[in-house]
Amino acid sequence: MAQQHLKFAIFGNEYQAKKSASIMQILSYLEKREAEVYIESLFYDFLTKVEHLEVQAAGVFEDYNFDVDYVISMGGDGTFLKAASRVGAKGTPILGVN
């Protein structure tokens, strides 16, 4: 039987460039554990086009079109609330990293 990999959605704040190192640590950790990582499109654009980071992701999502096991919110209260509003009634656990 094939092992199922956990799926994560990541939301972030594109105004907090100083957190780029922490973001890359989290992405590296998840990649080593063969997790599927999906990144919110605005945050992905920030990481790749503004910060010029090489980000490995299974996909990029907008709005509510993601189906994951966990959500990681990288930022403050506003980012967490944005993630919570997108999760809605799905009941997906959210980990907030400030």
Go through each PLM region and give its residues.
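Active-site-adjacent beta-strand anchor residues
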Residues: 12, 40, 73-74
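Short glycine- and acidic-rich boundary segments immediately preceding or forming the N-terminal edge
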Residues: 28-34, 48
